[in-house]
């Protein structure tokens, strides 16, 4: 809720101001490991409209350095070099596998967390620090009680698994369908 209140915003990755629609479309490429829909396409407008509807009544939260919505997640105090991958594996199997499956592939209600259908190595969650911070505030669903160390251990385990490589040019539609893109095609 409130995500739309952070846009337009400066994006260091794209090195320019982006709109909510830009952000949504870029998630198709990185977090969903798919092709970026064209700007103004039916799916683009539908998803952006939905996200905006979830932000109704929220105050605008502009930030000149990066997008910051009401749910902005602060990085944890623990650092990746303090992680224990074996402890992370054990925690994953006892706390996460019920929904995301032992093999990390998820099911019809829960997304995969590694493998060919998961987020790629260009997604924000492919950073151990980002994933740990997100796990701390969002997982397990409806019972967010992981310690900072547990979130970090699970993050290092999950991100040690195979996932698709992000290649920007392979995630863009053809030039004829692209419309305006918000970054250099070399990033």
Predicted segments, located by residue:
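Post-cleavage N-terminal segment of exported redox proteins
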Residues: 12-85, 161
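Gly/Gly-Pro-rich "capping" loops immediately C-terminal to redox-active cysteine motifs
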Residues: 1-23, 105-137
